[in-house]
A protein has these predicted regions:
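Polyanion-binding surfaces on beta-sheet-dominated domains and ring/shell assemblies
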Residues: 1-192
């Protein structure tokens, strides 16, 4: 579950004259946040900083809170997609939509998209690739890589390239889902 608070006035000690301050908090299912949550916060904040048009809200702050309810794998990609949709729902101006996928490199070298938690544990490496997806003037999709995070040992450059390529194609599917979800939400608002 992801919530967006703001934009609101930033504290004087943290405000930036030329742009928005973006805070990300990741809360685990139970207990206190640990190093994994702190790393996720940094990765999400870095990716969202590329996505949000920060110059539109100088001296303001936005807080994105990710509450993990369950972890069945691909948590970083799921949190990023949730954060992007929450920002859209809050009306925050974005450069594009964040889309991508987690891929697991299995021991035999095969690449598995959207692995579950057990598949991630048994994988040689887990790679999360996320793209800023936006429409070009001709109607085609532009996918710009903004985050590639690997855990484990990716033994060959070809394996990493295969993970990024598969995630690039999955980004098109995620973008289509975004469009469908937003059209459904818009139609529900129009009917009211």
């Amino acid at each position: 579950m992801v919530a967006v608070y703001g934009p609101c006035e930033a504290k004087r000690t943290r405000e930036q004259i030329d742009g928005l301050v973006l805070d990300v908090i990741v809360r685990p299912t139970a207990g206190l946040p640990g190093p994994i949550e702190r790393e996720s916060e940094q990765l999400i904040a870095q990716a969202l900083a590329h996505l949000v048009l920060t110059a539109h809200h100088p001296r303001m702050a936005i807080c994105v809170v990710v509450q993990v309810l369950a972890d069945d794998g691909a948590l970083l990609a799921v949190a990023m997609h949730g954060a992007c949709l929450a920002l859209v729902h809050a009306g925050v101006p974005l450069r594009g939509m964040l889309a991508g996928c987690t891929a697991a490199v299995l021991v035999d070298g095969a690449v598995l998209l959207d692995p579950c938690a057990d598949e991630e544990r048994n994988a040689q490496a887990v790679v999360t690739s996320l793209f800023c997806v936006r429409m070009r003037a001709g109607g085609s999709l532009e996918r710009q890589l903004i985050l590639s995070h690997a855990r484990g040992c990716v033994t060959a450059h070809a394996q990493h390239a295969a993970c990024d390529g598969a995630a690039r194609e999955a980004a098109a599917c995620v973008t289509a889902f975004y469009r469908q979800a937003m059209e459904r939400q818009t139609m529900a608002l129009v009917r009211k």
